């Protein structure tokens, strides 16, 4: 979705993450869109705080690059729980998994979420960097509403929250089959649910997991 010439809604979300002080950026997307998005967005973005230090001595050496990684949905999740809310969880799990393969000390203790559908200035979060890095969760608000009200506004969560998000999806997602009775009696004891009732996590909005 283009916002301006050569600037898309996804560029806006990446810029917001950079302004928030993220050390790496993880983009969740469908597997068939990874190459296109990588070609459009690239492999890194410069930290705007360091980018604007034009008058510093050797300013080119002070640049800080933030790597961008792409997280396709797992085949087992497609058409089962690949909602926008699951995308947040999937990106965080990919960040954890990749970091743990190098060192447990690299596992992030906090995550910042930015949405392509956000319609606010991405620079507003830069002045809140210290708060975003603090132990308390951070929520952008507009007219008293936050992501908990279903608004596409930036927020943070930690590893404890991530665990709660995953548990909520696991407990509330409806399976493809439901039990007819506790024990087998004569005929079948499981039946396939109607298509519109299977895998309800496909339709979970972001507020459904954040409020869990």
What are these regions (language model features)?
Residues 1-57:
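N-terminal glycine-rich phosphate-binding loop and ensuing alpha1 helix
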Residues 4-7, 123-124, 208:
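Solvent-exposed, flexible loop/coil residues
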Residues 16, 23, 43-46, 61-64, ...:
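Glutamate identity and glutamate-enriched acidic tracts
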Residues 19-21, 104-108, 128-135, 183-197, ...:
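Flexible, charged surface loops at secondary-structure boundaries
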Residues 36, 47, 54-172:
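Conserved beta-loop-beta/alpha segment of the NTase-like Rossmann-fold superfamily
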Residues 155-212:
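Conserved alpha/beta core of the MobA/IspD/sugar-nucleotide pyrophosphorylase nucleotidyltransferase superfamily
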């Amino acid at each position: 979705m283009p916002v301006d010439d050569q600037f898309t809604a996804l560029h806006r979300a990446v810029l917001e993450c950079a302004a928030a002080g993220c050390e790496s950026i993880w983009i969740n997307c469908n597997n068939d869109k990874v190459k296109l998005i990588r070609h459009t967005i690239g492999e890194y973005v410069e930290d705007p705080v360091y980018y604007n230090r034009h008058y510093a001595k050797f300013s080119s050496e002070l640049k800080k690059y933030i790597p961008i990684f792409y997280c396709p949905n797992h085949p087992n999740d497609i058409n089962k729980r690949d909602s926008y809310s699951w995308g947040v969880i999937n990106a965080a799990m990919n960040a954890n998994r990749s970091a743990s393969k190098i060192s447990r000390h690299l596992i992030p203790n906090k995550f910042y979420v930015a949405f392509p559908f956000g319609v606010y200035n991405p620079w507003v979060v830069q002045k809140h960097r210290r708060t975003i890095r603090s132990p308390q969760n951070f929520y952008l608000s507009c007219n008293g509403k936050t992501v908990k009200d279903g608004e596409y506004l930036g927020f943070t969560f930690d590893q404890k929250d991530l665990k709660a998000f995953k548990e909520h999806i696991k407990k509330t997602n409806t399976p493809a089959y439901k039990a007819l009775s506790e024990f087998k009696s004569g005929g079948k004891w499981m039946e396939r649910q109607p298509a519109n009732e299977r895998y309800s996590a496909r339709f979970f909005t972001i507020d459904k997991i954040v409020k869990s």
